[in-house]
């Protein structure tokens, strides 16, 4: 090599891989921002000066445009400010501007009672939504019974959906107290009042309290009477006892509001509802509905394994928060191997056995109805035939009782119950005697599968479909596994046939079936899915919050009752164990229905709610 020449490449004594690797500077963005902030504080390389309240803040256009839609538009769309060395921000305070600019450079926003109004105003003006969101989070911590109306007005001025939703939750959880305060009655808007009165989350002792709050608001100012109909249509008058409607509510409404308000019609509607006791399930409107957003998983009745108890009259629901089974109003009579259906927000219990011998001799034809609004059971029209080990469907505005058995043996008859007439009528029967089968509803069609036709012999694989519009039963593709005393339910686009038992052809001994198969009505095809963890003959079944729940049951091989709850996750095709039942039980029914919330539950629910919406 010539003397004085530069070596341009190091000679490699060993070979180095030609594959590339990426190395990341983890602190890069933080370091860049820190150095930019240091330059800003020293006035280095700043190309714009922001002016507010005649005070100046140097900054870098590039960073402002990256962090703020407001500045991005100002500096890129040819506005005159793009060429000015100083930009005056009308409507921004220096206190707010300095806090926001410091936040853009340092990532930290200092908020306190002295600057929050200024910072919120400036952040909203400059469209720096992360800062606005932090302001909302700060204000949520400060909401109190003294300032909630001011903060609600602030949320309205700046269209702060997150803060507005939080204050709504704050008011709803304390409505019973706040709604009678002078500040609320004088300042709350008609739109907000209607939203609160129409909410399922509103805290109150009873519906009458909401009516009183509405009447107090309406009578505060004469011009509000024009809004009486809009306000009172949110009161669930049918939830008020009939005696109170006639002797307290009607006189109050008539004396406080002019006839032109047309509000007496709400009371008349509620009285008609109370007078039509049996028809109530098919008279449902928004005003007859319970004020709740959640449905509960329940089990009713059953045969328990403990001595001296035998049959149960328990009605229990699962408290999702405590994961405990809580007792609701018990059945009027002990029952097992009955059926349950929900219609119009009412729970119906039909048939079943009134003794531990459920062979059919103790079959019942009684129909009980539970109203969660008043937590009461009543007896309505009995079925034409006594039935045990049958299926009860709820479809449109009627119930359908399918097959079963009684003291005369297996049944093929099918009958429907009309709440409107409080009567049962026979419809097209099954093509064969059937009991110990299972059923479900899918898109207004009744499906039943399996079961026995006579006392002796193996169970069936058949699947039948009933169209109530044409009153016709049709055969569908049979299951791959014969079964009886099993469970059926519909979830998504599939019908599931779950567990049960069968009799051995050789020994005639009964054995447990753990297999589960899913049926596609569109394809008329069965597919095997994950099997059960435990035997489940004569168990309760319900679909709750997108999962299948199997409650209790009986194992023929182990001759044992079960208190296990098995839960199926369709997405994972996996069974797991849920909260155990209080007792080992079989011949139990399960359903999902909205229940009247306990007052303490509503108070718990109302506290600490923090909506996570975007803070705009």
From Swiss-Prot:
It comes from the Eukaryota. Residues 46-113 form the BTB domain. Transmembrane segments: none annotated. PROSITE patterns: BTB. Keywords: Kelch repeat, Repeat, Ubl conjugation pathway. The keyword Repeat applies. GO terms for biological process: protein ubiquitination. Residues 148-250 form the BACK domain. This is Kelch-like protein 36.
